[in-house]
């Protein structure tokens, strides 16, 4: 099954539970389900990109801080999909390129990636935290239409950026979440109509000190929305962030050796 993973960087469950009106509407109409999960520690971006995409916790991967700038030593969803002959793409922050394609990031070489031998074969990568989410979703849709990827990562940054500027309990942070929900309302109906499985989550949350990295619930509790016939949409599940990689690989139908939250998947997904 073709699958889209949306990582809304820095979106705390504290805000996702009330600000994402479109996503909750789709859930209310039986097209998806909303869960929450606790992110791995430390609640920092680069370690948790690695956790989500490889299923390996930061203390095991060695990516334990944002300043650990090296390629991943683990196999990611991108690797499994590419090796199975599937097509991969990402519209994402440049740390994704550094983890799985090449490091250090060289904008002239890497910002627009068209390299079928790399794990992320096709990509639009940005390095400015203020890069507009509206443009990022357009970048993603351009990749989808041009390359027809089996696995597409969409990774906007403006929620996290607003949190670092204004904090969790700010209108700016909440409104950035609402804006991301609006962009999803523009694009996601088309994805679902074309049979995509869609997972929307966050790497970590945000606190009122305009930071994250620790163990406060607002930093560690993040949303998980799932949409599509590949998901069971069962209530009461407690998926782990380390299980998302294997669950995505199972949706894609590729051979892998990662942990899976089986109850998230419908009977047709293995």
Where are the predicted features?
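Feature captures the catalytic ectodomains and active-site-proximal regions of enzymes
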Residues: 1-270
């Amino acid at each position: 099954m073709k699958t889209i993973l949306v990582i809304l960087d820095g979106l705390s469950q504290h805000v996702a539970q009330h600000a994402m009106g479109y996503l909750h509407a789709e859930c209310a109409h039986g097209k998806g389900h909303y869960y929450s999960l606790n992110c791995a520690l430390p609640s920092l971006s680069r370690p948790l990109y690695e956790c989500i995409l490889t299923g390996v916790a930061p203390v095991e991967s060695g990516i334990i801080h944002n300043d650990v700038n090296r390629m991943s030593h683990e196999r990611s969803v991108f690797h499994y999909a590419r090796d199975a002959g599937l097509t991969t793409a990402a519209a994402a922050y440049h740390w994704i390129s550094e983890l799985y394609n090449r490091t250090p990031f060289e904008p002239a070489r890497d910002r627009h990636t068209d390299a079928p031998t790399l794990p992320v074969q096709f990509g639009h990568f940005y390095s400015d935290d203020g890069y507009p989410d509206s443009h990022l979703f357009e970048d993603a849709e351009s990749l989808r239409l041009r390359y027809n990827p089996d696995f597409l990562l969409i990774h906007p940054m403006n929620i996290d950026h607003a949190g670092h500027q204004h904090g969790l309990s700010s209108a700016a942070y909440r409104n950035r979440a609402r804006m991301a929900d609006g962009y999803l309302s523009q694009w996601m109906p088309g994805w679902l109509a074309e049979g995509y499985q869609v997972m929307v989550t966050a790497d970590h949350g945000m606190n009122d000190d305009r930071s994250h990295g620790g163990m406060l619930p607002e930093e560690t509790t993040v949303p998980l929305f799932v949409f599509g016939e590949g998901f069971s949409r069962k209530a009461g599940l407690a998926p782990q962030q380390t299980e998302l990689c294997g669950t995505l690989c199972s949706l894609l139908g590729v051979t892998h050796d990662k942990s899976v939250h089986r109850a998230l998947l419908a009977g047709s997904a293995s």
